[in-house]
């Protein structure tokens, strides 16, 4: 049996990080990941023990989730200490942009560390499209090189499926992009879409896609039995 790949999830306190930790914990090739949080994140431990934060059942095995590990502060040395070979970033766009650049300049990626980024930091290669994120890279050349090297992580399509296994940096697609691409790809391949008439995608998602930060807009009383449009002219 092949040795399990040691993984880590940075941003394990968020919805994406929680779900990712659950999937990794049940995967036969990975097992429970190292759970990490940024030092700027605060974790409430009231009502829990052994360093397992209350309200985060994936860190204590509650809720039938097979991950039992406290969330630790992130550091590059912690990754090396635990022998992590694959790091998942469930962090904001700007944070992912900064961290991957640090990993490259610090030599971790050249020493074998691979990164899968769940944000939009590395998805778009065309500069005019990346402009919507307003990135301000401290190391512009390294960031540009990483942008070119990043592989779009949609394995259902070629050549992505062939590139992902050996990629040092994988840019995980967003939810809307995934749903639209997977629906359109076979239709386009079969020549069933009239591109001259354009394509309109009417997409909707659950409110959890907005993240766990509480706002009046995402409060239960605002979203229950309701529907609203957001970022109509600036969605990324």
Give residue spans per PLM region.
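N-terminal Rossmann-like NAD(P) cofactor-binding subdomain of oxidoreductases
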Residues: 2-232
């Amino acid at each position: 049996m092949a040795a399990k790949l040691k993984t880590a999830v940075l941003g394990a306190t968020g919805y994406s990080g929680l779900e990712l930790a659950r999937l990794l914990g049940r995967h036969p090739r990975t097992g429970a990941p190292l759970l990490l949080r940024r030092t700027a994140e605060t974790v409430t431990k009231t009502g829990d023990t052994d360093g397992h934060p209350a309200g985060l059942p994936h860190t204590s095995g509650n809720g039938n989730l097979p991950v039992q590990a406290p969330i630790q502060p992130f550091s590059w040395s912690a990754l090396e200490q635990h022998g992590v070979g694959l790091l998942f970033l469930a962090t904001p766009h700007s944070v992912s942009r900064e961290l991957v650049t640090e990993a490259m300049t610090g030599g971790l990626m050249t020493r074998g560390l691979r990164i899968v980024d769940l944000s939009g930091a590395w998805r778009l290669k065309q500069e005019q499209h990346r402009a919507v994120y307003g990135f301000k890279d401290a190391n512009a050349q390294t960031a540009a090189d990483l942008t070119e090297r990043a592989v779009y992580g949609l394995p259902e399509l070629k050549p992505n499926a062939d590139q992902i296994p050996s990629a040092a940096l994988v840019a995980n697609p967003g939810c809307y992009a995934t749903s639209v691409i997977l629906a359109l790809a076979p239709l386009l391949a079969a020549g069933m879409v009239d591109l001259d008439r354009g394509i309109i995608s009417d997409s909707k998602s659950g409110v959890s896609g907005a993240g766990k930060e509480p706002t009046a807009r995402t409060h239960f009383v605002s979203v229950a039995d309701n529907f609203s449009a957001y970022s109509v002219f600036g969605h990324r």
